[in-house]
């Protein structure tokens, strides 16, 4: 822009800068330390990300709906995926993020998968080597922190479900550099000391992947596999999986569930096995197929419009999370199904089944009625869950549509404003161009008139009009401008204003001297 260019408004300049940034920095990945973190009630996250030399402000819209399990704080090192834009009211460039990863989690997940595949190949997770839980376990070893809520949950469940039981607590730290070693030592202690323990529970509450990393150590996996006492793993929440879960004989989604599993009666095992078999065979595939068809429908519907890529991305994340949850559920129920089959094959359960076969017809009828009642309850629960999932998906879809509608309206307003601004600028430029052309034409006319006047004053014919004459030789070959070129009796052609005349030279004078 030159110095003579007309001035523009601040908003126009800001919009130009914004367009340049968004066009050239559509996708960026940046890492650094968070500061000034603010999570609003609307679910939007505002922050600044910095390193030792620079600070960049940023925003993450709808953060709470995507990362509900962990809230970032000042000082966290993160990796952001997003785009650069300009916040016009402040004239400030910022990053608008659509994905956030806590620094270190990516490397830990890669280590987890590599270690899991290697140990699985070595046979540490082989279902054939897993030990069945004894029926009616009464002496239970618990390996966990003595001060947390986990041990209290286990004791509360055991007190409610079991009339006679004994818990032997081995206190350990469940997080940190020494946690895996302490838990391994606890397992060895129970195996080396004859204390009559029927089963062991390794328990801990939920946390991030860093918090649960002790349960992914190879040392702990090998100690679990080497144990002669059956081990129940109850680490983290239901969606958390550690290598301890894969190596243990039974995996429980929570510490409370571990206490329920360890003291279940044989008729409960039988009933749950039947219910799980019906549930897995009758509903799992239908549920997965229905969800995939629904997601495919919405994906095909929204993918046809490039402008709706944000909603498409949100639906993709939702579908991936849903598929992971379904796979996790299936893996969990498969493990429980295999475990129950092993229990039913044990000698104790065979004797129980033989005894149950001898019961009278009234007892069998009562059992069938209970099974029917439970089946009806499960069907109702399944129907309710499916309706809730569908309603939740509809709400999310409607929310995405509302967002897209708002963005569309904002885009139309922005386009109209931009067109008006460009139209005003075009009118101003046309006026300036007309003025400049008119000024140049006036100057050119004045210059032409001056040249015409000068040419007119130099025209010989105009000089003749003032009483002068022009002399030529008789044949008009050349102009006579000096008396020296004349001699007596020469014929000279004289050009006047209105004609010509031929004269004869009588005498010639040069500078008052007479010649010939």
Curated annotation (Swiss-Prot):
Pfam families: Exonuc_VII_L, tRNA_anti_2. It is an enzyme of class 3 (hydrolase). Keywords: Cytoplasm, Exonuclease, Hydrolase, Nuclease. The keyword Secreted does not apply. One of its GO terms (biological process) is DNA catabolic process. CDD domains: ExoVII_LU_OBF (cd04489). The keyword Ribosomal protein does not apply. One of its GO terms (molecular function) is exodeoxyribonuclease VII activity. One of its GO terms (cellular component) is exodeoxyribonuclease VII complex. Its EC number is 3.1.11.6. It catalyses: Exonucleolytic cleavage in either 5'- to 3'- or 3'- to 5'-direction to yield nucleoside 5'-phosphates. It is found in: Cytoplasm. InterPro entries: Exonuc_VII_L, Exonuc_VII_lsu_C, OB-fold_nuc-bd_dom. Bidirectionally degrades single-stranded DNA into large acid-insoluble oligonucleotides, which are then degraded further into small acid-soluble oligonucleotides. Heterooligomer composed of large and small subunits. Belongs to the XseA family. HAMAP family: Exonuc_7_L. This is Exodeoxyribonuclease 7 large subunit. It comes from Chlamydia trachomatis serovar A (strain ATCC VR-571B / DSM 19440 / HAR-13). The lineage of its organism: Bacteria, Pseudomonadati, Chlamydiota, Chlamydiia, Chlamydiales. The gene is xseA.
């Amino acid at each position: 822009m030159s110095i003579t260019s007309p001035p523009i408004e601040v908003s126009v300049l800001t919009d130009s800068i914004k367009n340049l940034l968004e066009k050239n920095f559509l996708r960026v990945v940046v890492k650094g330390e968070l500061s000034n973190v603010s999570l609003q009630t609307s679910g939007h996250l505002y922050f600044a990300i910095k390193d030792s030399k620079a600070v960049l402000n940023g925003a993450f819209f709808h953060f709470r709906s995507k990362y509900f399990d962990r809230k970032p704080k000042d000082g966290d090192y993160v990796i952001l995926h997003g785009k650069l834009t300009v916040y016009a009211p402040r004239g400030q460039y910022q990053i608008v993020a659509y994905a956030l990863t806590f620094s270190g989690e990516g490397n830990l997940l890669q280590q987890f998968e590599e270690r899991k595949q290697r140990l699985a190949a070595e046979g540490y997770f082989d279902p054939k080597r897993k030990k069945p839980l004894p029926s009616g376990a009464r002496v239970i070893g618990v390996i966990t922190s003595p001060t947390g809520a986990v041990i209290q949950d286990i004791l509360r469940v055991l007190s409610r479900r079991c009339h006679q039981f004994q818990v032997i607590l081995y206190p350990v730290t469940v997080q940190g550099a020494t946690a895996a070693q302490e838990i391994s030592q606890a397992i060895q202690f129970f195996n080396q000391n004859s204390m009559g323990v029927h089963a062991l529970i390794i328990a801990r509450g939920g946390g991030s992947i860093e918090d649960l990393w002790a349960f992914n150590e190879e040392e702990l996996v090998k100690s679990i596999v080497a144990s002669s006492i059956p081990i129940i793993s109850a680490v983290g929440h239901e969606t958390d999986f550690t290598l301890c879960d894969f190596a243990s004989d039974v995996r429980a989604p929570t510490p409370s569930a571990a206490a329920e599993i360890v003291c279940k009666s044989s008729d409960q095992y039988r009933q749950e096995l039947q219910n799980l078999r019906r549930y897995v065979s009758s509903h799992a595939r239908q549920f997965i197929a229905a969800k995939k068809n629904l997601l495919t429908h919405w994906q095909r519907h929204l993918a046809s419009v490039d402008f709706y890529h944000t909603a498409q991305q949100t639906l993709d994340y939702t579908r991936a999370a849903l598929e992971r949850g379904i796979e996790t559920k299936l893996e969990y129920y498969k493990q429980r199904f295999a475990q129950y089959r092993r229990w039913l094959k044990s000698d104790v359960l065979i004797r129980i089944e033989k005894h149950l076969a001898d019961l009278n017809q009234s007892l069998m009828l009562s059992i069938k009625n209970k099974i029917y009642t439970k089946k009806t309850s499960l069907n109702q629960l399944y129907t309710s869950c499916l309706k809730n999932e569908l309603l939740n998906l509809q709400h999310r879809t409607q929310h995405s549509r509302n967002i897209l509608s708002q963005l569309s309206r904002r885009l139309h307003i922005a386009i109209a404003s931009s067109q008006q601004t460009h139209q005003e600028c075009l009118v101003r430029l046309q006026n300036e161009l007309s003025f400049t052309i008119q000024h140049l034409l006036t100057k050119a006319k004045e210059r032409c008139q001056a040249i015409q006047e000068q040419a007119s004053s130099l025209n010989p014919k105009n000089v003749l009009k003032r009483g002068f004459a022009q002399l030529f030789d008789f044949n008009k070959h050349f102009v006579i401008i000096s008396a020296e070129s004349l001699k007596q009796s020469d014929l000279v052609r004289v050009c006047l204003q209105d004609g010509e005349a031929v004269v004869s030279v009588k005498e010639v004078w040069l500078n008052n001297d007479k010649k010939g």
